[in-house]
Swiss-Prot record:
GO terms for molecular function: ATP binding; phosphorelay sensor kinase activity. Member of the two-component regulatory system SasA/RpaA involved in genome-wide circadian gene expression. One of several clock output pathways. Participates in the Kai clock protein complex, the main circadian regulator in cyanobacteria, via its interaction with KaiC. KaiC enhances the autophosphorylation activity of SasA, which then transfers its phosphate group to RpaA to activate it. In addition to its output function, recruits fold-shifted KaiB (KaiB(fs)) to KaiC to cooperatively form the KaiB(6):KaiC(6) complex (independent of SasA kinase activity). PANTHER family: HYBRID SIGNAL TRANSDUCTION HISTIDINE KINASE C, TWO-COMPONENT HISTIDINE KINASE. This is Adaptive-response sensory kinase SasA. The gene is sasA. Its EC number is 2.7.13.3. The lineage of its organism: Bacteria, Bacillati, Cyanobacteriota, Cyanophyceae, Synechococcales. Keywords: ATP-binding, Biological rhythms, Kinase, Nucleotide-binding, Phosphoprotein, Transferase, Two-component regulatory system. It comes from the Bacteria. Residues 152-365 form the Histidine kinase domain. It catalyses: ATP + protein L-histidine = ADP + protein N-phospho-L-histidine. One of its GO terms (biological process) is circadian rhythm. The modification Phosphohistidine is found at residue 155. Homooligomerizes. Interacts with KaiC. Participates in the KaiABC clock complex, whose core is composed of a KaiC homohexamer, 6 KaiB and up to 6 KaiA dimers. SasA and KaiB(fs) compete to bind to KaiC.
Length: 383
């Protein structure tokens, strides 16, 4: 909560509706800093609410996307949403101050000339136009969020289907027994059931509800992923190297989503690594805030001009051989997941020397207990 300014000033009550991972974003951290440090001419009160804990706020304030900042007082209520909440707020504060001065003097503005040639009616129309533009931007954000979620979930559906198909093939060839086969299929069906619930959530555009960050052993998750992909690399004489320190700290992340990122990166590495090649999975913690995960391969590499584009939505690079189909939506999904966790993802590659994808994950620091302070003070990972 922010309480700014001497008593006796007009109250400015704000409600910030944002999930835990959103509070670490640059815009919201800048917003809190602005409210704490700047003299806005109001007695400022800021409350923070997590929509995953208080979903009724989304309906109460008719929010279609978060994060959102709501001005509760002075009336009328206003809602700011999107990726530039701070700039929107800075644009409106002077207007609120002017309205407060006029109200304090007991004046009632009429359609008389203001600011030289602009009438009060014109100013009101301008304000209404700004509100309409804001609502339009919010709707556009909602549509884009729905598209991203649909692509993410649709892409993720391939993983359990592929695993179930491989298990069926292995069982027919006598490589696994019936108990092992049933165990694999059962777990994959459970995954698809969870994904079907995600698809239902897409219609509400509540991205944060698809993530459940918690204390997580990333080394164990990576071991499960490597075992799951075993059939893909054993038959091709591809060596998998791992470098994971025994003292690797636990991370604060969603288990399903981290598994999805590792699967995507390792599948891409296997796709582009030829027979007899190698893939390296490494994890390290250079600071007390971030674990750095790298997946490197000995494939053909990625052209310099494409290394930024591969993380964009709807970008698919041309295939490099009959066996590969090009980097698709998987990398854009990885980027979204990593960024929602507050981290970064990037690639280092040279032609004919392979590619190395690296992403960062926040270290567990009791976020589930005191998440408010933790995420507000947490910065972005260094490259």
């Amino acid at each position: 909560m922010v309480d700014d300014g001497p008593k006796g000033r007009q109250q400015l009550k704000l409600l910030l509706v944002a999930a835990r991972h959103q509070l670490s974003g640059q815009d919201l951290r800048g917003l809190v800093h602005y409210l704490e440090r700047e003299d806005l001419g109001f007695e400022v009160t800021l409350q923070v609410a997590d929509p995953t804990q208080q979903p009724e706020l989304l309906e109460l304030h008719r929010l279609v996307v978060t994060p959102a900042l709501i001005k509760l007082q002075p009336s009328p209520k206003q809602v700011f949403a999107g990726s530039n909440i701070l700039q929107q707020l800075k644009g409106w504060v002077p207007r609120w101050k002017q309205d407060g001065v006029v109200s304090g003097l007991g004046l009632s503005l009429r359609p008389t000339e203001l600011d030289g040639s602009r009438t009060q009616k014109e100013l009101q129309l301008e304000d209404q136009l700004l509100v309409l533009r804001q609502e339009n931007e919010t709707l556009i954000d909602r549509i884009h969020a729905q598209e991203r979620l649909l692509r993410m979930v649709a892409h993720e559906l391939r993983t359990p289907l592929t695993a179930a198909a491989l298990a069926l093939q292995s069982q027919r060839l006598g490589q696994i027994d019936m108990d092992r086969f049933q165990d694999v299929v059962t777990r994959r069906l459970e995954e698809m059931e969870a994904l079907s619930k995600d698809l239902l959530e897409v219609g509400t555009t509540r991205w944060e509800t698809l993530f459940n960050p918690q204390r997580l052993d990333l080394a164990s998750v990576s071991a499960e992923v490597i075992l799951e992909l075993e059939k893909l690399w054993l038959g091709r004489n591809v060596e998998i190297r791992t470098d994971i320190p025994s003292d690797l700290p636990k991370v604060f992340a969603d288990q399903r989503r981290m598994r999805q990122v590792l699967l995507n990166l390792l599948e891409n590495a296997l796709k582009y690594t030829g027979n007899g090649g190698h893939i390296a999975l490494s994890m390290l913690h250079r600071t007390n805030q971030w674990v750095e995960v790298s997946v490197c391969d000995s494939g053909p590499g990625i052209p310099n001009e494409e290394q930024q584009r591969i993380f964009l939505d709807r970008v698919r690079l041309p295939q490099t051989s009959d066996r590969t189909t090009g980097f698709g939506v998987g990398l854009s999904v990885c980027r979204r997941i990593v960024e929602v966790h507050g981290g970064r993802i990037w690639v280092v590659s040279e032609p004919e020397e392979g590619a190395c994808f690296t992403f960062t994950v926040p270290i567990w620091q009791g976020q589930g207990q005191e998440w408010g302070q933790a995420v507000l003070t947490e910065g972005q990972a260094d490259p």
